[in-house]
């Protein structure tokens, strides 16, 4: 599936400069400060959204399902420890690259299979469906190297987060049914239902459906760009990271 349609897709987003008031970097730094209101909750949301790429990376490194789960939890918990965040104040960089490098260092310097379970269990940041995660991993037909697989899973996680944000907006506006019908066309699915059939189901004209798809593609592009903006350190890096994501999911 092509997640980036050439018609009003992510690269054609009308958003100009993105706001950097709440990046993933700032979420980690705030979560490390006990006095920061909502910091830990924000970090939990970040973990929920981006834990799977790291889980899949660990599985590709040869760790078992339970080892990968425990190591993943423990790694994120370690990011909340103040003494591990001293070097995070920086002016640029991709959060994707930081997380992977930090996990690699975590595995090399502090953890082995024998100690994984001792600290990982019982420190769940948020409840996760680990059975679903393992099923998802086993269903992936690709035999990518761990680092390549991580970048691929990260790209799809960013895309899915933007799509969920769009769904939430439409649900709040009472347009969830419209979203359900138009979603395949937002992601460039060539096997999506014809506009005429969608129009008949929704009681709209075919022209109105086309306008709806165009507008939702624009909004999807905005939300995707905003999500990418939260994972980089400067506005100059947004376009480059978007291009990188497009290349990854198109490979």
List PLM regions with ranges.
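Intrinsic, short, N-terminal disordered tails of RNA polymerase sigma-factor systems
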Residues: 1-251
């Amino acid at each position: 599936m092509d997640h980036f349609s050439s018609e009003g897709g992510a690269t054609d987003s009308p958003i100009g400069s993105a706001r950097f008031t709440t990046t993933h970097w700032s979420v980690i730094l705030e979560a490390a400060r006990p006095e920061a209101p909502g910091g830990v909750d924000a970090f939990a949301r970040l973990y929920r959204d981006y834990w799977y790429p790291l889980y899949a990376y660990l599985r590709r490194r040869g760790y078992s399902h339970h080892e990968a789960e425990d190591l993943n939890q423990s790694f994120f918990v370690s990011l909340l420890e103040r003494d591990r965040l001293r070097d995070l104040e920086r002016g640029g960089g991709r959060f994707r690259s930081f997380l992977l490098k930090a996990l690699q260092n975590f595995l090399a310097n502090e953890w082995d299979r024998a100690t994984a379970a001792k600290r990982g269990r019982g420190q769940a940041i948020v409840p996760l469906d680990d059975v679903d995660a393992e099923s998802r991993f086993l269903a992936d037909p690709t035999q990518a190297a761990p680092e390549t697989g991580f970048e691929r899973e990260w790209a799809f996680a960013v895309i899915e987060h933007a799509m969920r944000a769009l769904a939430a907006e439409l649900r709040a506006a009472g347009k969830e049914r419209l979203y359900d019908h138009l979603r395949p066309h937002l992601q460039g699915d060539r096997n999506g239902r014809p506009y005429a059939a969608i129009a008949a189901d929704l009681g709209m004209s075919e022209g109105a459906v086309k306008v709806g798809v165009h507008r939702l593609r624009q909004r999807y592009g905005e939300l995707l760009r905003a999500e990418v903006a939260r994972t980089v350190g400067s506005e100059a890096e947004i376009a480059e990271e978007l291009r990188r994501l497009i290349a990854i999911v198109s490979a």
